Regions:
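Hydrophobic packing and interface segments
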Residues: 1-172
């Protein structure tokens, strides 16, 4: 009998494990390619990966029922629908701050890492930004797989319910 928290922890573990494997693979592949600045380019990938994780955690914080922003939004519904609308718009605007700041810092850091902290090396700096985007999207596969789990499980439960099976089937 798994609890929701156990399932979410398992999904988070899978994402974290894939992130670690991506970091190891990045450093190994770029080292094997024997590039002059393989370490700095690898750091740009890691910066992108960190930015992706920060965006994901920020999204979870502002949208999960387990955290204060959504709890506070639901409490605002006690005073009427207008309060919910105003609070929701404000919360939506506030929730974009962390991802935007993370992307800006990530762009600057990945540029500097790939360029070797040399502002005149524009080509390599721009490559660093591009490779950081690859790092940011590198966990997309497992993230989409974990996001797809919820609707699939819900549909399976609905099918079990419509077919007249017992409540124990729905709980499984």
């Amino acid at each position: 009998d798994a609890k929701m928290k156990d399932l979410l922890n398992s999904l988070a573990f899978g994402t974290n494990l894939s992130s670690v494997l991506i970091v190891v693979a990045t450093f190994l592949v770029l080292w094997l390619l024997k590039l002059d600045n393989w370490m700095w380019i690898s750091c740009s990938v890691v910066v992108g990966l960190i930015v992706g994780i920060v965006i994901g955690r920020s999204t979870e914080y502002y949208t999960s029922q387990s955290y204060r922003p959504t709890q506070k939004l639901s409490e605002s519904g006690k005073t009427g629908p207008a309060t919910v609308i105003i609070s929701g718009i404000g919360l939506g605007m506030l929730s974009t701050a962390i991802p935007v700041i993370a992307v800006v810092v990530g762009i600057i850091a990945s540029y500097l890492f790939a360029a070797g902290f040399d502002f005149s090396n524009v080509g390599l700096g721009l490559y660093g930004i591009g490779i950081a985007a690859v790092g940011m999207l590198s966990t997309l596969g497992i993230t989409l797989a974990t996001d797809a789990y919820g609707p699939i499980a819900d549909n399976a439960g609905g099918n079990a319910e419509m077919s007249g099976l017992g409540e124990e089937v729905r709980k499984r």
